[in-house]
Every structure is written in structure tokens, then in C-alpha cells.
Amino acid sequence: MSDNDELQQIAHLRREYTKGGLRRRDLPADPLTLFERWLSQACEAKLADPTAMVVATVDEHAQPYQRIVLLKHYDEKGMVFYTNLGSRKAHQIENNPRVSLLFPWHTLERQVMVIGKAERLSTLEVMKYFHSRPRDSQIGAWVSKQSSRISARGILESKFLELKQKFQQGEVPLPSFWGGFRVSLEQIEFWQGGEHRLHDRFLYQRENDAWKIDRLAP
């Protein structure tokens, strides 16, 4: 098969979206109510990693970067994730705190996009979550200098075993280079796939203490 034939096959990959629509009359005033409903349905549908979200940031040269992390908490203050504070994304957020999140629930023909500003969590919040993690995950947080170049996986595995021995007694301490961010809720867009590519899109945009809702063309 030639490269051109393969590209033609990819170009024809598509399907109709038929799982239902989204109507203005059915929307709650608060977008978190709809988000909670959709997230619950994603969990009930047993989607793989229903809390997985893409975090998009930009560096000092306006070069965008994306990666997938797990949502760990959400409320009216924002959406929370945790990371190594020496990571690329943490440095980029420090330089430019404006970020975008995306929840891609393909099986349900849905996606949710959040736009807001990321702020560091308090040490108390981070410590509370850190000590709720499985012990091996706590140790794993100590192992990796995230985004740095390494020559082989064995370096990580050896370091993990070394630290597992070191921390075998008592609590695993919270690394000073590990923390979390809360992304404020300035805009939330809900997308529901529709037949004939007539998808339903609704944008919630915060205006003072209320939410303005607009339908967007697909």
C-alpha cells in the first residue's frame, strides 16, 4: 500500500454521531451541574479513565504544549490536578497561568472544554491529597525529575527501589517539588455530537456572579 493510499483510507474514517442532542431548555443555570451529570454518566459507562483531561499550556515563545492528567477534585472554585513542580507544565504555568482543559469522552460523543487561570494549591491541600495516594505512588513522586532527559528506564527503577527501602518505616514525606494547581472556571463549553455534523455546542461564560449561556455553531 502506498503512502497516498494510506492517507486516502484515513481521510475516509468517520462515523455519524447518534447518541442524542443537547437543547437549551435542558441546560442548568450552573455548568458544574451539567459537568457532574456528564462525568457521572462517563463513569457509569465504564469509560477508560473518565477523569482524564488534556491540559494545554504555552511557553514563553507562545509554543503550545498538551498532556493528559487526571482530574482530582472540582467545585465552584475550579478543577484540580497534581504534578511535579519542576515539570514543563508547571514552569509554563508559572510564566503564563492561562490554561485550557479538555475532557474527551469519545464513546459518549461528548467533550467538555474549560478555560481559566491556574493557581498553586496550598501546602495543606497538597499534603492531604499526597497522603491519600497509594504508598508506591507517593514514593514514585520522589523518583522522577519530570521532563528531564534520562538514558534508560532502569535508572528510574533503581531509584524507586532505593527510595522504597529508605521510606520503609513511617510516612513517606511530601516532596518539596510536588504540588497541585486549581484552574478557575471562566468559560466551560459542552459539545454533544449530532447527526450530519450538526453538533450541539453551548458555552457558559462567567459574568460577575452569574453564567451567560450561548449556543455556538458547530
Swiss-Prot record:
GO terms for biological process: pyridoxine biosynthetic process. Keywords: Flavoprotein, FMN, Oxidoreductase, Pyridoxine biosynthesis. PROSITE patterns: PYRIDOX_OXIDASE. Substrate binds at residues 14-17, 72, 129, 133, 137, 197-199. Pathway: Cofactor metabolism; pyridoxal 5'-phosphate salvage; pyridoxal 5'-phosphate from pyridoxamine 5'-phosphate: step 1/1; Cofactor metabolism; pyridoxal 5'-phosphate salvage; pyridoxal 5'-phosphate from pyridoxine 5'-phosphate: step 1/1. It is an enzyme of class 1 (oxidoreductase). Its EC number is 1.4.3.5. It holds the Pfam family PNPOx_N. InterPro entries: Pyridox_Oxase, Pyridox_Oxase_CS, Pyridox_Oxase_N, Pyridoxamine_oxidase_dimer_C, Split_barrel_FMN-bd. Binds 1 FMN per subunit. One of its GO terms (molecular function) is FMN binding. Homodimer. This is Pyridoxine/pyridoxamine 5'-phosphate oxidase. It comes from Shigella boydii serotype 18 (strain CDC 3083-94 / BS512).
